[in-house]
Amino acid sequence: MDMFQGDIGKSVVEVLERLCCEIDSPEQQICCGQPAYNSGYVKESKNAMKRMITAFEHADYVVSPSGSCVYMFKEYPEIFKGDPLWASKAKALAAKTYEFTEFIVHVLKIEDVGAHLEGKATYHTSCHMTRLLGVNEAPIKLLQNVDGLQYVELPGKDRCCGFGGTFSVKMGNISGEMVQEKVHHVEETGADYLIGADAGCLINMGGRIHRQGKPIKVMHIAEVLNCR
């Protein structure tokens, strides 16, 4: 997040601080290891995972603005099941890790963060976040309580945008057709904003929207909730 979309990370911090959370972002944290692991670099990815486990060992909660990364954290215990020490540490990390909107709604018990944004918005439900983490209602509740924002459901909302991490590289033609279909559905809503909760999906859809010159602003939900 700090490498590609720093504004999203900044928004996450500012929103949570307004909700009275004390934020710490350990300098030793790196990638969660998912791209390397999914590409077959198991040994290398485990080194990254161990570093992440250690970095967040003393945190009360770990919050991420990416359902994909959170799901990877949840997979750590299974990945380290042959190593009792690291499996135990991985299990502890997984238990306290939450997706950003999930944390706000289900842990902090807040559905209105006092955000304001004028316009019409639709929301893309990313695959890992909804299908694997089961985080479905939290982001919608938060968006519906943004003052001035009209929420419109996205047709075919349960369909993948075509990113899928390395899928978009390995299966470029198929990925391109999938994201084009998604952009078409976004246009059908007449939305001013396309909102999502996973950076990969937003980069994929945002790139296609930009190249086609569509008048639609792509935003991460953290940026929306940080609007005043």
Swiss-Prot record:
Q: Which residues cross the membrane?
A: none
- GO molecular function ontology, one term from the record: oxidoreductase activity
Q: Which GO terms describe its cellular component?
A: cytosol
Q: Which Pfam families match?
A: CCG
One annotated GO biological process: lactate metabolic process
- InterPro entries on file: Cys_rich_dom (IPR004017), LutA (IPR022822)
Q: Explain the purpose of this protein.
A: Is involved in L-lactate degradation and allows cells to grow with lactate as the sole carbon source.
Q: Give the family this protein belongs to, as stated in its UniProt record.
A: Belongs to the LutA/YkgE family.
In terms of PANTHER family, this protein maps to: LACTATE UTILIZATION PROTEIN A, UNCHARACTERIZED PROTEIN YKGE
- What name appears for this protein in its UniProt entry? Lactate utilization protein A
Instruction: Write down the species.
Output: Lysinibacillus sphaericus (strain C3-41)
Gene symbol here is lutA
